Amino acid sequence: MKTVTDYFGDLVFDDRVMKATLSAKVYSSLRKTIDEGCELDISVANAVATAMKDWAISKGATHFTHWFQPLTGITAEKHDSFITPSPDGGVIMEFSGKELIKGEPDASSFPNGGLRATFEARGYTAWDPTSYAFIKDNSLCIPTAFCSYGGYALDKKTPLLRSMEALHRQTIRILLR
């Protein structure tokens, strides 16, 4: 029989999983992004995306979703599949750093699914690496912020992240006086 300590956090891509699945260089760069807000290089994002995908698939996930909290008061998700058709009729499992970092929740670029042109899309999701990804119902849930293309917050997380950054900046300013 499994105990709580055996399965607690088992479906979370947390620091333990990152250390185990990422190279030391990639892990260090990701930690710098998380801890200091440094920009994430696309090669690091690709390595993290590959590790996340492999880990998620090993836990039974077949899809990923950018998970966010719009101002409606409930969570929202846009699901995509890891599965991509291959030229020989089979499938390959793919997930890129670009897909990890930024998503498009309103489907404006879908061939038949969008209600508006892509340039009219109301916003996009952006990965928040300070929150751990997790698996729910066989989907890798990637915590994201939801912003308009003009930079306006369209969710509850963006103001929190911005206030944390402002508080950090002012604390450093006061401490270095």
Report residues per predicted region.
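Glycine-rich, acidic/polar active-site loops that bind/position phosphate-bearing ligands
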Residues: A126-R177
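Active-site core of metal-dependent hydrolases
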Residues: D6-A121
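Flexible inter-domain linker/hinge segments
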Residues: M1, D10-V12, A166
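N-proximal short alpha-helices
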Residues: K2-D6, S29, G37, A133-L140
